[in-house]
């Protein structure tokens, strides 16, 4: 798990989040995501639950880097996407592969998805949603059209404000410090 901060005079890390083309089929062991934990501290009880359980993402998928952003980094990111202020803590799952074939034409700006835990006030409910989220990622990490699976899950669960497809993410909006 990576903790990104800019203390001690180290140069600021810059993420080059550009989707890759994939030649091989996806497997459960294929690196698929960059996982970002964004948390400004608005919802302390839910933040505590997430921070206690986010290591599970790394345990389930050590091939996917997990970045725990500092409060300052989280604020800087949310300044670029103010519509998400107050919805953190959130887990951003950046998909490193472009969708193949027709799906890339249907969703040309697809970049991944996120779980907005800040809209939940009860820590136990947040933990249950985090567990469902990890189960969703586990079941669908080899899907050719992950955005289709997200849409299907949204329709099934009716959680349109909980898990959202990141359609308009640009390098600048995900340039995290």
Regions found by a protein language model. Name each.
Residues 45-50, 77-80, 102-104:
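A short acidic (Asp/Glu
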Residues 80-109:
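A short, hydrophobic beta-strand/beta-hairpin element that forms part of a small beta-sheet core
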